[in-house]
């Protein structure tokens, strides 16, 4: 039995006994395995179906993957990534940890309580630069591994409100997410390039999208912002029972936004995404991404991105958004310094 296997066995034994430990052990003890994690145990018995050639030598070790809520997108993708790492034959012991998502994951990774974190690239930018949510709390050790898929800023407006453009939000009752949340920052930035402030709105409500959807249904508000992968189940549910307009952003305004905040990307969604949408629309999105701390070895960072991009089928099987992850888009929207180990892999595949 190798030293790392012995350590892993001891850690499991302590967990079963309810023993205490340092923060990393607590994170492991509190982690909830996804279905993909559970399948990992079976995969280890038969070797799994993971492509793992050409990896760099490493000591392996425990990898806590900070994701998001169990009902979100990050959690199943984190489970799939843990499955890939556990079956790579490099003695990694990985587990997906349910968390409060982006902001919390930055803290977990930079404090050493998680090795890998799923976050939005705008949050990564704020953390690395000490702005917005991280004003006075700069996380200079945060490093990027890769970008994954777009999380689209969507504006849902009741048809009866008459809102068709962002300028039409003036004088209307609008939900902007929780105070200080990533969604609210997106709202302020988008309104800013349109010359709109909160004072121009009829009413500003700080609501989650689930709360906002209920108030759109009851007529208490006219529109709500949500930043999420498309299609969003919450938006889909709302559009199924009520006439809803998805509000586009003009391409010239999208360009202006991207010039000012380079972590955004412009994209077009097809008319088939949501009920009631009858034409292609221009929207903007931030990118989901994987981050680590600068202390992670080059070898581990290299192995993680190599294993991820050479086993994308496993990611796709865990969640539809896994199918949006692509090597040729891995650095699109990268908002912070790339870990040198990850950069080594990207440089190799370009040759």
Residue map of PLM features:
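Bilobed "Venus flytrap"/periplasmic-binding protein-like clamshell domains
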Residues: 60-88, 92, 96, 150-218, ...
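A structural signal for short loop-to-beta-strand junctions that line the ligand-binding cleft
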Residues: 135-148, 273-282
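C-terminal motif of bacterial Sec signal peptides marking the signal peptidase cleavage site
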Residues: 13-16
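Immediate post-signal peptide segment of exported/extracytoplasmic ligand-binding proteins
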Residues: 23-65, 160-173, 240, 340-343, ...
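Bacterial signal peptide processing site
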Residues: 18-22
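A bilobed periplasmic-binding-protein/Venus flytrap-type ligand-binding module shared by bacterial periplasmic
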Residues: 152-163, 257-262, 286-299
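An extracytoplasmic/periplasmic, membrane-proximal ligand-sensing/linker region
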Residues: 204, 211, 218, 228-246, ...
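Pocket-flanking alpha-helical
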Residues: 79-83, 95-136, 155, 210-215, ...
